[in-house]
């Protein structure tokens, strides 16, 4: 079972605050699972300051068959999320994140254009513990309340949605801690403002049906087509899908 290190965080004028981290055994098993299911990582983006959970990001380089970077969080799943009572016993209370980047992405993450992906991963990873809530399939996140401000100057993408992440065999990714608790992996997929609005009205599955196959592949494409740019949201979903098929 993940332990709480109560002696790791102090700030002047504040009460002691627990940090949720994997044990050494859990961390080793997790790393081995990533190597077997997603790929060998050759870099780790280490978190220098951890007020609540310790979230490192494993970086898996492109290969001949999968020509893109894979970013995988490590540490988010040490915290057991406060899921709704209706799914309390269904194994949705632990999660980790995956994000895929094109092979020419600058991994120094020093500029807005390159670094927003790290900020999104960190933001989502801490949402559950900061808000005493949970994250899961179909949940959306943005950099501002209205999702109107793009992540960077070179894109109009302004929010993200969580989809189920798949392993090398295209099966849904799950990892089990030694205590048998399941950790679900979610793909962080960027959206445009109009796509977020469509999802909020019609749901995740309806939004995904609009995408071409080439854009469903979840590699971040900062210039991809906006699938909801010219859609009238006052129509019902069946009318919209009929219009798109014409």
Give the location of each predicted region.
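Acidic, proline/glycine-rich low-complexity IDRs
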Residues: 1-72, 76-82, 88-92, 98-246
